[in-house]
Amino acid sequence: MEEIRISDYTATKVSDTRFGLDAGTMFHMIPRALWEKKVRPDEQHRIFIGLNCLLLRGRGRTILYDAGVGSKLNEKRRKIFGLDPTATLIHDLEKAGVRRSEIDTVVLSHLHF
């Protein structure tokens, strides 16, 4: 797991899943010949972006910054965004050695879904 130290806190990147967005929408006016050197779209013209959250631990606190997509989207929406049902934030938190019950603060920076 990727971790960095920030003052008295350890910051760990934890992933929920990845999601697909229309490549043309994402890159807008950038020519495909340029962006396709770095990323290849799938057959539905989507590029996939990691949906990552930040786990902060320190000073006796465990803070989760953003909470991923969750499990409430219906199958149609999950398919549209190409969400992997086997990748979950809970799984990555467990890999980081954290149980849900240990998180005392959740910060939601913005809402997408």
Q: What is the predicted function of each stretch?
A:
Residues 1-95, 102-113:
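Metallo-beta-lactamase
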Residues 95-99, 112-113:
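Alpha-helix capping at helix-to-loop junctions
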